[in-house]
């Protein structure tokens, strides 16, 4: 489990389905995906993350408010195809009623720190559809820089942002 000032990030359980489905089936939340998720796709999402935990020791984690225990989204690290390479990527989905409160930034920063502290990766990515300003603003706020713009069959054009271990260490030193 990862803990931040306001959030807990924990492994998914099947009990998270209803709260996750509310997020993933919402057209506004999923506007940067080809389509919102149906029930089957949402169940598969949870199963995929349970498989990732078993295979890699990480995946997307449920994001819950510390104060209330309410499920507000997910955030974590998965292995994603970024312009033909399988790379470690921080992703996040936050319920729209919690947008613009810094929750994605807080969760993604905690995942970034966890990844550099608990894996051997020398670079961590986030990728998103070019129209997803909120997502790349979160990446920039967490020290990532745009490293690639590429055609992506899922997204028309995708942007990839990244931070290296060295850049992360320098950020940590500056914040200390």
Sequence positions of predicted segments:
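Short loop/turn motifs at secondary-structure junctions and domain boundaries
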Residues: 52-56
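Conserved GNAT-fold acetyl-CoA-binding loop/helix
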Residues: 28-48, 59
């Amino acid at each position: 489990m990862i803990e931040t000032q306001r959030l807990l990030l924990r492994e998914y359980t099947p009990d998270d389905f209803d709260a996750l489905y509310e997020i993933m089936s919402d057209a506004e939340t999923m506007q940067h995906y080809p389509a919102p998720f149906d029930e089957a796709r949402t169940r598969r999402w949870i199963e995929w993350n349970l498989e990732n935990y078993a295979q890699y020791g990480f995946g997307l984690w449920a994001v819950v408010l510390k104060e209330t225990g309410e499920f507000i989204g997910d955030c974590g690290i998965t292995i994603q195809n970024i312009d033909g390479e399988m790379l470690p990527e921080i992703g996040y989905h936050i319920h729209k009623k919690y947008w613009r409160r810094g929750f994605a930034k807080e969760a993604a920063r905690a995942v970034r720190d966890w990844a550099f502290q608990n894996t051997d990766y020398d670079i961590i990515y986030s990728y998103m559809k070019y129209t997803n300003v909120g997502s790349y603003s979160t990446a920039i706020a967490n020290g990532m820089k745009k490293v690639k713009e590429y055609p992506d069959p899922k997204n028309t054009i995708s942007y990839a942002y990244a931070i290296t271990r060295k850049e992360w260490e320098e950020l940590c030193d500056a914040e200390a």
